[in-house]
Design a protein with these regions (language model features):
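Conserved beta-strand-loop surface patch within small alpha/beta domains used
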Residues: 1-84, 92-161
Length: 161
């Protein structure tokens, strides 16, 4: 089970609702003092504007982390002794599923044979319809299946109750 603190889940939901109708993205870290949500910049609109042939989708149906920002946030997390729990993004007006594009980006070099780009890190997809969170699902790499599969999540308090 992937542990997500209630306050962290609420922060990610709020980000998804505030960003609607565009996809949002971010990182959930585990720190010694609890989980930390870091909102990230979705650069998909800029990519689409710069080259609509190469990037036909805009931020309403796609997301892309700002690579420099992601590198800096993960560096800061490493320095603080934090661990990445998961990456999250939203699906405005769509269900909570892990798309082929999501899978490709989560794989090292986009190749199944190379495995996940971030071993041990899960992915949360938040479905938002008309500024209301309808569903959310987590996905993690399954070595036997050689694929990302839906994985249950819950709060740490619920697991210890």
């Amino acid at each position: 089970m992937i542990e997500i603190e209630t306050s962290a889940l609420g922060a990610m939901h709020a980000h998804a609702v505030e960003g609607f109708p565009e996809e949002v993205c971010g990182v959930l870290f585990a720190s010694p003092n609890g989980q930390v949500v870091r909102r990230m910049t979705n650069v998909q609109n800029a990519l689409h504007a710069a080259d609509p042939t190469e990037n036909p989708r805009d931020a309403r149906t796609a997301y892309q982390f700002d690579g420099a920002e992601l590198l800096e946030v993960t560096r800061q997390g490493d320095e603080a002794g934090w661990r990445i729990v998961l990456f999250y993004h939203s699906h405005p007006q769509h269900g909570a599923y892990f798309s082929d594009t999501d899978k490709s980006r989560a794989l090292f070099g986009g190749e199944v044979d190379l495995g996940p780009a971030f071993p041990g890190v899960a992915y949360l997809v938040i479905s938002v319809y008309d500024r209301v969170v309808r569903d959310r699902k987590t996905f993690a790499w399954n070595e036997a299946a050689q694929d990302f599969v839906e994985t249950p999540f819950g709060s740490p308090a619920a697991r210890h109750a």
